[in-house]
Amino acid sequence: MQQTASVNMQDFGYVEQFLDAMWMERGLAENTLASYRNDLMKLLQWMEANHYRLDFISLSGLQQYQSYLVDQDYKQTSRARMLSAIRRLFQYLHREKVRADDPSALLVSPKLPQRLPKDISEEQVDALLDAPDPNDPVELRDKAMLELLYATGLRVTELVSLTMENISLRQGVVRVTGKGGKERLVPMGENAIDWIETFIKQGRPALLGETSSDVVFPSKRARQMTRQTFWHRIKFYAVIAGIDTDHLSPHVLRHAFATHLLNYGADLRVVQMLLGHSDLSTTQIYTHVATERLKQIHSQHHPRA
């Protein structure tokens, strides 16, 4: 079965209506919507080539598409993500009475290996946070951002989109709008507060110049920084700190925040609230990282290990 670049326009319309509904009802971020669109366009292209339509494709047809993805060597994680988009689409079509049934409900999800978040030690975190030169406005901004990330466990997308009204230095909290438009208040800690205050007074005016902006951490062009740019900045400082960048991810400080809290006995549900996880099982993966770290310390320092 071949895949072509064309799609049925009626099916395309259904997908666009679905994406609009996801944006309005669930407040999904642009990145998530773009991922849904990309995955669903692949489905529509395959359907067009194989004479299926959204309003009559059966469970068997969707299973054929799953087999096609396996034949095309898509990773398990990619196939699981695509299946998630497909299920949401067919749930929507069933709800809107485009279909009398939901064939996706019986699809079997690919089994995913449990992946532990990439972990760095407290010493490596200290080295990373000490890498920026606070005498330079750009690096002072980066220093404040890194301190805030480690203090709060924010997602990178949440960090770069912060506005001045989201931060209360007096109360010591940051108000974050996370996935699905859910708001949460996260304490910042004195160290992060001090560096943010220093940046706002000394570094931010130098970056903004004559430009007005509500963004807390503007780029050199006085715009909102992209998450890709900030990831490049993290890798830049990791090299300075002597940390192997192959062992880093954009959320390295979010992972360190969660793992180190658990290492020091924080309650799992408190960590869940701080991270903005809707499901406790998502947070529980960090307990495995914390346990592995404790085992490592035990084997290194116990005389009978």
Swiss-Prot record:
Domain Core-binding (CB), first and last residues per copy: 9-94
Residue intervals of the Tyr recombinase domain: 115-299
Signal peptide (from-to): none
Highest taxon listed in the record's lineage: Bacteria
InterPro entries the record matches: CB, DNA_brk_join_enz, Integrase-like_cat_sf, Integrase_catalytic, Integrase_recombinase_N, Integrase_SAM-like_N, Recomb_XerD, Tyrosine_recombinase_XerC/XerD
Active site: R155, K179, H251, R254, H277, Y286 (o-(3'-phospho-dna)-tyrosine intermediate)
One of the protein's GO biological processes: chromosome segregation
GO terms for cellular component: cytoplasm
Main location: cytoplasm
Subcellular location: Cytoplasm
Keyword set, alphabetical order: Cell cycle, Cell division, Chromosome partition, Cytoplasm, DNA integration, DNA recombination, DNA-binding
GO MF annotation list: DNA binding; tyrosine-based site-specific recombinase activity
Function: Site-specific tyrosine recombinase, which acts by catalyzing the cutting and rejoining of the recombining DNA molecules. The XerC-XerD complex is essential to convert dimers of the bacterial chromosome into monomers to permit their segregation at cell division. It also contributes to the segregational stability of plasmids.
Family: Belongs to the 'phage' integrase family. XerD subfamily.
Quaternary structure note: Forms a cyclic heterotetrameric complex composed of two molecules of XerC and two molecules of XerD.
Protein name, as recorded: Tyrosine recombinase XerD
